[in-house]
Amino acid sequence: MNDVKSILLVGVGGQGTILASKILTQGLIENGYDVKMSEVHGMSQRSGSVSTQVRFGTKVYSPIIGEGTADILVSFEEMEAARYAHFLKKDGKAVVNTYRIPSMPILTGTRDYPDDIIGMLRQRVSTMALDATGIVEKVGNPKSANVVLLGALVKAMRLTDIDWNPIIAKTVKPAFIDVNRKAFAAGMAAV
């Protein structure tokens, strides 16, 4: 039986994709899963694409997620969801932040932001669109949208039996523990 689950987290540099992956990975390891993670930073310091592949289960041999094999795609920005959608299984799920960060070609007017990315995803897979950026403004720290999306992912993957509060406390800076716990809870509540 293949019990390995594959999660692809994608975003733009500075959105906290890697931190969310580290919290996820730490929680899974501490709860007995074999976990493999792979990061691709790209031009992350210049608002470029960042992706993290997390695979977990009883025994995982590789961190690499092939095209058409991801169980879930968590996108911190809409365009990144379109860019990585081909990695999802036919019965996969997408959790997408509706926040948009225009790329340089869009800013210069040489390209347009694609219309209805969420609609395109919904035609292919089960898609949960949420305004993680708006949700986190109510929590108090706009930089915690990554943890809102992590909370939504945990709920969507049915990993709610894990106590994530101590994991968050171990992984984020002490000054940001409370706001990240609130962001995580808000993400779970949004799904």
Model segments located where?
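Active-site cofactor/cluster-binding pocket
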Residues: 1-191
